[in-house]
Amino acid sequence: MKAELIAVGTEILTGQIVNTNAQFLSEKMAELGIDVYFQTAVGDNEERLLSVITTASQRSDLVILCGGLGPTKDDLTKQTLAKYLRKDLVYDEQACQKLDDFFAKRKPSSRTPNNERQAQVIEGSISLPNKTGLAVGGFITVDGISYVVLPGPPSELKPMVNEELVPLLSKQYSTLYSKVLRFFGIGESQLVTVLSDFIENQTDPTIAPYAKTGEVTLRLSTKTENQALADKKLGQLEAQLLSRKTLEGQPLADVFYGYGEDNSLARETFELLVKYDKTITAAESLTAGLFQSTLASFPGASQVFNGGFVTYSMEEKAKMLGLPLEELKSYGVVSAYTAEGMAEQARLLTGADIGVSLTGVAGPDMLEEQPAGTVFIGLATQNKVESIKVLISGRSRLDVCYIATLHAFNMVRKTLLKLENLL
């Protein structure tokens, strides 16, 4: 099946908004085995939008339009598509009720007549409810071509796609089953090299590597009759892949950490903390609370995390954590001594089972004769205090901090897995 994505909005063409929806939708279509052959952006103009829809209908089986579902006159996606299909616009009962509920809590004057446009769908279409907004989406097939209309804001589009569109398309079109393997501690180029014979000779299942910031994923996909057969085929391939070794001789399984498109090192670590009923704290310098805010973003985080420290300066490390100032000056803040001291003191002061610390040089300048991207990560438990040094070179400050937190979560995850192996 050939699909085409059409982003509607003059603000995309003028560069005011980045079209992140295209990447998200392309990934979702790939998961379903639907090939996206074309991506188009068009302004808020009926004539040009009609032209784009006409072209897409001549070369694609599935046309997905994003944006232009709002209440204003320049929001004309549904109106233009309805005109092209020679269909009327009708009101969706559920969407109308949502409008009623929304405006019932506001001043009567706030409900202007143009808001009703958001509850309209093309006659004969399947409505796609909007859980986070007011503009309803829709799906319709006419003359063998399927059309989807989605809201533009990613906060509305993503839930609608994940919860409404993907299940709908899965039932109608897809026989593709996928499994995503996640890796940390190996680059895409080395992973592809190690698995080159599998990738070059792939037929079914297929293997697709993707580089993320600080990590790599492999999507394994197969077309088969049912989930049970897919699980068997993908499981066999996974076992073969993970039996390989890195160029340094390390088992590939050692740098594999989990499954799923939406998974993360932080989530894996959080779930292990919950599983083993362990608490954690952190003392952060260069990351300025990123580790802690990431951990706290998971529902139920209070089960494992009660608080921590952000000690950006040397003086605050001494004041808040009780580390000897003269020793800090002697060893420097970018050191194993400081990382281990921060982790241990954070653990002792909060009574947590595990203490983590991050200290280093975010860049772009050197600090204490250490290059940008030098990070020390400490970890303290009741029985052991240790640290690792990582060098995250050629990255922005934000990337250095983000990747440093990945290393910290991975360090905690490995510690918890050792505990798992002892049980």
Swiss-Prot record:
Pfam families: CinA, CinA_KH, MoCF_biosynth. SMART domains: MoCF_biosynth. Coiled coil: none annotated. NCBIfam families: cinA_nterm, molyb_syn, PncC_domain, PRK00549.1. CDD domains: cinA. It comes from Streptococcus pyogenes serotype M49 (strain NZ131). InterPro entries: CinA, CinA-like_C, CinA_C, CinA_KH, Competence-induced_CinA, MoaB/Mog-like_dom_sf, MoaB/Mog_dom. This is Putative competence-damage inducible protein. PANTHER family: NICOTINAMIDE-NUCLEOTIDE AMIDOHYDROLASE PNCC, NMN AMIDOHYDROLASE-LIKE PROTEIN YFAY. Belongs to the CinA family. Gene3D superfamilies: 3.30.70.2860, CinA-like (3.90.950.20), MoaB/Mog-like domain (3.40.980.10).
